[in-house]
UniProtKB/Swiss-Prot annotation:
Domain of life: Eukaryota
Signal sequence residues: none
UniProt gene name: MEC3
InterPro entries: Hus1/Mec3
Main location: nucleus
The protein, known as: DNA damage checkpoint control protein MEC3
Function of the protein: Component of the checkpoint clamp complex involved in the surveillance mechanism that allows the DNA repair pathways to act to restore the integrity of the DNA prior to DNA synthesis or separation of the replicated chromosomes. Associates with sites of DNA damage and modulates the MEC1 signaling pathway and the activation of RAD53 in response to DNA damage at phase G1. The complex also physically regulates DNA polymerase zeta-dependent mutagenesis by controlling the access of polymerase zeta to damaged DNA.
Other facts: Present with 414 molecules/cell in log phase SD medium.
Amino acid sequence: MKLKLIVNGCEAPDDYKLLRTTINTVASLRKTAILRFNSERLTIISTPKSSLNSSNNGTILRGDTGQLWCTIPHDVFRLYTVISARELNTITMECNCDSLLSVFKRYDRVMNQGSSSNMTIKLQSMPEWNTNNGTLSGGTAGGVDTTSKPNPICALGITFEEIVHTSGPNDAIVMNGGVDEHNGLPTTVGTGNLLASNKVIMHSFKVPVKLLFRAQDTRIQEPMINYIQLMMYKLPPISGEFGSAFHGFIRRVERYSNVNHIHLMGVKKKEHGNEGDDVELKIIVNELDWHLEICWNGPLDSVIQRQEGLTDNPSQNQHIDTDGRQEEGSLPIIEADKPMSSLYTNTRDREMEENIRYDEDLLRIEDSSIADTRGNIYTADTSGDTEFNDISVMVEKAEQESSSTHEVIIRCKDWKVCSKLYAAFEEVVLAISHDESCVFHCSLDRGSLEDSEDVEKPRERGQIIYYIARSKGL
């Protein structure tokens, strides 16, 4: 296999910022991360338990923990070469986030001092680092093999140049005489005869990484989201008018250190058409013998995903239960689940389509009849002899259809991660999959559309997606 990357922070500052921000965000939340390279992009994956230190090299990611998935398009790099014999040309490894981030910080200092150098990243074999693997993990106990094959240890070799400007110790000062052009008076100007020279310093680092076997890589699957029972909120930007207030709303629950779970609830009232007036978002604490509701009263945009917008390809509609449980009496598994990263690329188009559908519903004229869950049809009676029980059923049904509620119970510590992500990015979307999971989606821009080589097709944006499985059922 072969891996070689080149990035230049001075020539492409927006692309470098995307890469640097992603690594910095993951390092601020996790100690280790999985780097998965393929022909299309780099994916950075991390959970609180993404470690291969166990002797059995078991599964890396667990479904009951918050999973952080970040994608970086391949055209962020000036050179992106990945050669592998695996499916989709994949190379997967685990690395320490702080070690990788420290190299980027050093590169930042070099750029700030005026040097414009390429950062080259190569995967290097390190046989001397693997000499003790067989000794430490091999052997038998009572004739039984107690260990499995260890993961090979390699290095990400990172190099870049720094140009240091130096000058000679015996610089002479020459006094040159002349005449000022404005007033014709003689003037004297002192100029330095500097004996300047440049010194090139080559910085080289080796970041240890642990290559994953094919079976381990296969077990790392992006969580699926049920797009039938999903509500998506476009949150106010942190630098906007309501950003500071919404950040305080998210962090309000952090005041209570003894709270373990929060109840996240989103309500959309269909009868209102004004922006922000038809959406409610609540954080409910209902434990320790007390009940608390924290409501956001500011503007909020929402998009409800419907079944009509789903693909008809069954191979893409596979369901993975994020918490690994299917309780009795729960809704049947619906073939309408996809990773958030694959479906968010056209969110603006879906929002426009939803608004058009909503306007069409307002203008549609239908028969005045309502059917309940048992199949009974209630038709408006103009004779005035409608029974009261029919009216009550109609009112109850109308109230249910006038609003849509999505709620989920998650861990409070996972919600604290969301507050950190919200403060770091401008464009954030919160998605609530009813009684299943919660997703915090952050988009990373790559400059304006004019900066793209293809003006008609904008460049792929970077994504940071935090998947949160429910901590318990409603």
